[in-house]
């Protein structure tokens, strides 16, 4: 199929440049359209900014002509923390949706087939593409949000215009297998208690503690959580819901905020099927990016939902019989605060294998 790019312009995203506008294409052929491999790699580099447990980045991509395949990397599943492997799937779902967003900003609709190979459970998705009629400002805003999003463990101020923002976040959850709920303020203390209990249960879990120490080490790396992304003891004390990481000697930040005033959201699933959990990761991406577009800060939490007792408590707090998969703090960071440096990511050539390419 002939694809004519007219009035091509590029939108710089940090180290990336994606084609973002002005293509026309014939309606015939559709899935036979082949995307330039360079565009795919640029989009994958942007997509790999997705969050994952301890920034473990448990994904691997294969580009074969115009088809892109996502695989779970079993060597990057943190088994002591993530007993079921669900958090690795959530991270892979998030990177899959980030990729969809990046390709949309480049002018392509991503068609996703989840678990295409019943004989290979590591093969999570295959993606092919058709040209988009028109790239909107909304498509570009979501792609820009990928680079602006951070996992912010500091206390938040109250979210502005929450009523309208919460509606947008609910609309972002498009999977029938996943739901988004908010923990009522009056039940917040019970969630904080569940968070404390979850941490207490892990105090003497040597495998868990070893894993945590490894992924928050002092060494320079392209993975894990750098100390610049962690908080001091006093900062941690002002956020009652969260994982206990090794504390840092950072100067007290956001003293004007006081105690955390974030809204607490829960993404849960109607079953625990691997496909559903993968979709939940995609919905996590959608909620995080929509919140970022709205100018809000976010922090994903799984310390409570990693253990069945914690999941049961969270389900009762939202009044559902679903399985809570991830908690999201959403709130306001001070407007004049400088955006912290991004957490590191592995080089794209370590993550992406190109078997055949198109130009």
Task: Identify what each model region corresponds to.
Residues 2-359:
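Acidic, surface-exposed loops and disordered segments
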